Amino acid sequence: MKNKIILLWLLLIVILCTISNVKGCGMTTHNTVARRAYNFSSFDGFEQYQKYVSENFDVFDAGAAFPDFGYDCGGLANESEAAHWPPFLRAATKYLLETYPQPWSLDGIRLAVFLLGVTSHQIADISWHSIGGIQQGLIRAMAGQDFNGTYELAHGNADEGGEFELAYNYDLSWLSDKWYVPITDIKNIFHSMNYPRVDDENLLRCNAILYAGAMGVKIGGRFFYPEIAKKSPFLVDHYQDYFIGGLDDMSIWTSYCWPVLMGWMDGEDIGDFCFIQPDPNNDDDNQHLRLHHKHSILKNGSKIKEALSKSILNEMKITNNGKGVTFSLPNSMEKAINQVLNKFNQNPIGTLLEKYLPNLFNNKNKFYQENENEQYNHDEEELNIIDIDIDIEEEEQEEEEDKPIRMLSKNNNFKNYEYLNDKKKSSSSKLKNKSKKNIIKLNSDSNDLGTNFTTIYGQNMYSYFGKDIRSKDLNGDGFDDLIISSPGFGVPGSMQTGCVYYIISNGSSVTIDGGSGFTSEFDIDQVATGKLCGNETHAKFGWNIDVLDFNLDGIFDIIIGAPSSSNANLQYLGMIYIYLGEKNNPAGEWSTESDLPSITIQGIEYADTIGTVLRVADCNADSNADLILGSPHSAGGGTQRGTVQIFYSSKKRISGIPISLNDADYYGHGEVDYEWFGYEIKVAGQGDSSTLLVGSPNYHDEETAIVNIGKITSFPYNVNLNSFDLNPKFVMVGVNKNDKLGYSYNMVNGSLFGLDNVNDIMVLSLPTRGFGDDFDQVGEVVLIDIDNLSGFVEIKNVNLLLSIKGTTKYSRFGESLLIGKLESTDEFARLFVGAPLWTDSIDTGPGCVFTFLPNQHLTNDPAVLKQNIINNTPVVIYDSTHSIKTFRIDDDSGSSGGRSFNNKRKDSRFGFRILLSDFNNDGKNDLIVSADRDSSKILEGGSINIFQ
């Protein structure tokens, strides 16, 4: 029985291995872009195509993957390349109109839907691969950050890694279990383009490989997620939202371009295609148009893999269906998967694969009799299709009962997660033994917070409600108000125009029950006092927000960033919208001057993407908060070095007069390409003793070539300049790969943690820091006294006051940080740490927020503190249990350690943003946690969760 289970796992793994035979963005990346574009589109004027697609998703999904069919199959690389460009769409549209007169038959409709999928694939590859003049597409940026600028390495890892990112962090249940490919029509289109080698047989076989790979990703691709998470933090963090070539951007551009094709298919002149799409018919474009696909994650070429791949393909069910074929997997595959799932409860996958797979693969003769005379070229990653036997059934033949293919394993409770996460059950003690520092285990609390929080949800798909949150007393009544962004808000045809909501607490219908034992739920429209909305598609209005009195009239103003403004002309300049507040209404309530912005600031150069980071702090020692812009993608004298601009608040800020980015009162930029200077910005201290601290998490040392060590640059205030100096006081850099120093940090006066003799403590998170393979990217949060730092310093030489280490791989422990008191009478502040990718199972999890009382692990005794600094022996807090409980935040229970919160909703990114606010006006601060991809009500609609 044990060997049978292993063989079943091998079948699954071999399906996944076929992923490597596919080029371009991975198959399911293309499927996801196409389906997301369908949801983004209004089909205004082309409503029939929306109906066609909705009734033929099996055709649509096959079309979205199709252009990659021949790169490693049948020697059809040139034909596959041809399917990526506008001439193919022109030829296909001409064939459609000549072959299928209106009203279209089912075969005509299927071909039209298939071509919409093909178009999505073509558009997605442009920005993904930086083709046709696009210089900073996703793979280029990934190479610049994670692969020392080596495009080919990034390319392979992005194409395959995106599949595993999707399978792990997203729900693929929508992906069609059956695919239909219009074989005859596609063959005829290629022949009309003078590609005679494309025939029924190789179209059938090559598309079978595409289908097998897609189903492999859907069923079990999540188990390969650690491969890409380890290699590319960039892909994990920015696969969806990277400004040019991320999932959303590729989907928006597909929705921009579909009307051109639909117009052709409705009889409009077949001419130039979409703006983003370069054209081989244009000589200026032609030299840029070869995709040159290569891969690197899964190594092909082994005969055992090839033999087993053939075996899997032989199990596939292929049915003649009109002018095409339908691909499906038999129910026997479902039964095999069920056996594996049942076995999981007894034998975690980590031990099964670790114990048996090496022997199975090393002893190839058990599965494959090697032919000594056979010559095999390991450099050619091509599946030899000649010997694959595929039986094709006729459509009228009785079929098995349709059942959806089961995925591993959104709804299955796997035991012993630590086996996969840490390899060995005793690995927690391994880390303990490695550390020479005092380790304090965290206490767990049995009280269930699930009965004591209120959730407010976003109102439409992909709205990312809760992407940013702020709390400020807008109307001056002494009560905290909430400002919540939803940069993905929009309607089909005009998606991601974005909205920002504000809730004036004394007028809100939201009430949080303190102990009645139920969870309250609201939609944002039920409780919002008002909202401000953008009108530019895909501008991401609300990506970052903040509040200050910009025109010094005594009334707060709302600042809103829209970093993808000017996307429709591929400039991505970005825009800042400033809504001046007023109290001129009869009731004296706070409102904005208008629903339109009072003042705007626009980016100037390509990829400025201003509005990515907004912060407020006093920057000219006049006790008034000023506006700070961080633009990490901006050129800064190179490529994505990043810039920081500061605009002082002033009575000269007048409604109706835009501000030029060149008129900034302060300007700084990064030094190394892709360092992302300005990703985080804080101001420490006050008045003329203040310091500007700018984070560059992707900074790398060009001499050592260690990537993503990160840095924080400190610029002291210069009284003579009435501004921060351009020469740094200190530059602190990381030392290890993926330290990402500068990703997230906060500043606090030492007295809040009981250290009255320390002025400025930096609470610094290193969310991708790892401690060996067993604890890769578990994250760490450290407390540093920065009072005496100067010059160039490596973090390993900095004396730490406290270290808090995460325990869950790739959880992004420290993505968000918050320091504050629950009650004004509390003597010391708490530290809250967000880990939005945290999980407690083999599957993706909900995310989590941890809270600690640092003062209980620090000392106010100057002698002891001095000795700790001399010995470099900070206290280390470490949770070795993997046991996460929720609890009431006001229930101390005498605990000195940490506790945790989560909303128990998978894939929600709970903990992405956190803040404290007395939202229910009871005199105590409430913890407010955003989960910007919460899909429990609507797909990636997002939510905020309010804990009393």
Swiss-Prot record:
GO biological process, alphabetically ordered: cell adhesion
Signal peptide: 1-24
Gene Ontology cellular component terms for the protein in this record: extracellular matrix; extracellular space; integrin complex
GO molecular function: glycosylphosphatidylinositol phospholipase D activity; phospholipase D activity
Main location: secreted
EC number from the UniProt entry: 3.1.4.50
SMART domains xref list: Int_alpha
Keyword Hydrolase attributed: yes
A Pfam entry, by short name: Zn_dep_PLPC
Cofactor(s), by name: Ca(2+)
Positions of FG-GAP repeats: 451-512, 526-588, 596-656, 663-724, 799-861, 895-948
Localization: Secreted
InterPro entries associated with the record: FG-GAP, Int_alpha_beta-p, Integrin_alpha, Integrin_alpha_N, PLPC/GPLD1
Glycan-modified residues: N39, N78, N148, N300, N433, N452, N506, N535, N749, N788
Reaction it catalyzes: a 6-(alpha-D-glucosaminyl)-1-(1,2-diacyl-sn-glycero-3-phospho)-1D-myo-inositol + H2O = 6-(alpha-D-glucosaminyl)-1D-myo-inositol + a 1,2-diacyl-sn-glycero-3-phosphate + H(+)
Record keywords: Calcium, Glycoprotein, Hydrolase, Repeat, Secreted, Signal
Cofactor binding note of this UniProt entry: Binds Ca(2+).
Keyword Calcium found: yes
PANTHER family reported in the protein's UniProt record: GLYCOSYLPHOSPHATIDYLINOSITOL PHOSPHOLIPASE D, PHOSPHATIDYLINOSITOL-GLYCAN-SPECIFIC PHOSPHOLIPASE D
Family to which this protein belongs: Belongs to the GPLD1 family.
Function statement: Hydrolyzes the inositol phosphate linkage in proteins anchored by phosphatidylinositol glycans (GPI-anchor) thus releasing these proteins from the membrane. May also cleave GPI anchor intermediates intracellularly.
Name of the protein: Phosphatidylinositol-glycan-specific phospholipase D
Species per Swiss-Prot/TrEMBL record: Dictyostelium discoideum (Social amoeba)
